């Protein structure tokens, strides 16, 4: 289907967290049933502005998933709510940890229930065969769980050659203002507010911001802009996200704050500083020197290819599924032996 080969390894039931992450599972060796229509989403179904529906995937509601008789190879979940919703479904389960508990508190989303959520998750993991996979070491430490750490990945061959013809910076972020603490929005604004910048994403409160029309449009935007911006509090969020890795795969240098997990080396693949005035000077330098931007961007692409290739993600997630299946079988055998 569309050039993607699937084995007869069984289907995965995947709760949709966000399309860019789920799309990585295309080509993993399992066809996908994707649960859409979950609360807290910008759209009620799969958002094709983010990614096309993975080849061979079927979209279904939570009720349809709960009533399905399909024997899934594994269930892929992303929150305590997902775990509760899928409690009645038997099968190997993997929960993917995408955020920090501290970030939930900083965003004022769930300051009161963060400790309860962490305890609930730990109880689930101790009493069931659910296996936890964190997208980074920071996220694993925050929740105190994580059987495996599996960063997301990108396919550099999927992106356009970088032209950088627009003397503008670009950033991709949804609900940017609501995540001011996590994303160091004050630093971003102090450094870049007077410079030509494009903010891509669902941000109805920010004039001029909007989502890309589709993935092809996002690739075009990345290809034509001069540099990418990623700022994040080191205590709350990683020094990269999927969008910044996409930018690196597109050959853009990245500007941001100093961060222990940033893949950027200052002066080689981008520029890092906690001083907004210095970040502004770096940005102005790149806006005025497309050759420098191209040189740093080429190194950024080399780094992301070596460290974050989607092949490594898919191999790692196949292993996570196998480990979840093994744990589920052992749990079932112990239950039978106790009868």
Q: Model-found features: residue ranges?
A:
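Acidic donor-binding loop of glycosyltransferase active sites
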Residues: 223-237, 252
């Amino acid at each position: 289907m569309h050039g993607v080969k699937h084995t007869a390894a069984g289907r995965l039931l995947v709760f949709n967290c966000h399309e860019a992450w789920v799309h990585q599972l295309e080509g993993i060796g399992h066809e996908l049933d994707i649960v859409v229509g979950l609360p807290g989403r910008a759209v009620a179904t799969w958002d094709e502005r983010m990614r096309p529906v993975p080849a061979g995937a079927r979209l279904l509601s939570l009720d349809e998933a709960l009533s399905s008789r399909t024997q899934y190879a594994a269930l892929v979940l992303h929150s305590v709510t997902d775990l509760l919703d899928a409690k009645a479904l038997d099968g190997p389960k993997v929960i993917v940890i995408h955020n920090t508990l501290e970030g939930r508190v900083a965003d004022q989303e769930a300051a009161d229930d963060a400790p309860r959520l962490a305890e609930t998750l730990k109880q689930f993991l101790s009493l069931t065969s659910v296996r936890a996979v964190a997208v980074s070491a920071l996220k694993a430490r925050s929740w105190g769980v994580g059987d495996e750490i599996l960063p997301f990945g990108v396919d550099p061959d999927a992106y356009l050659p970088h032209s950088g013809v627009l003397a503008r910076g670009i950033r991709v972020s949804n609900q940017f203002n609501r995540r001011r603490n996590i994303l160091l929005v004050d630093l971003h604004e102090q450094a870049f507010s007077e410079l030509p910048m494009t903010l891509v994403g669902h941000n109805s409160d920010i004039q001029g911001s909007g989502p890309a029309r589709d993935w092809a449009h996002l690739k075009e935007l990345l290809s034509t802009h001069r540099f990418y911006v990623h700022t994040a509090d080191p205590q709350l969020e990683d020094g990269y996200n999927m969008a910044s890795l996409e930018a690196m795969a597109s050959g853009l240098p990245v500007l941001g704050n100093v961060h222990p997990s940033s893949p950027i080396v200052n002066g080689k693949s981008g520029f890092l500083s906690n001083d907004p005035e210095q970040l502004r000077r770096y940005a102005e330098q790149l806006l005025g020197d497309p050759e420098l931007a191209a040189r740093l961007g080429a190194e950024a692409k080399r780094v992301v290819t070596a460290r974050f290739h989607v092949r490594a993600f898919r191999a790692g997630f196949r292993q996570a599924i196998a480990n979840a299946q093994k744990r589920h079988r052992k749990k079932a055998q112990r239950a039978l032996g106790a009868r």
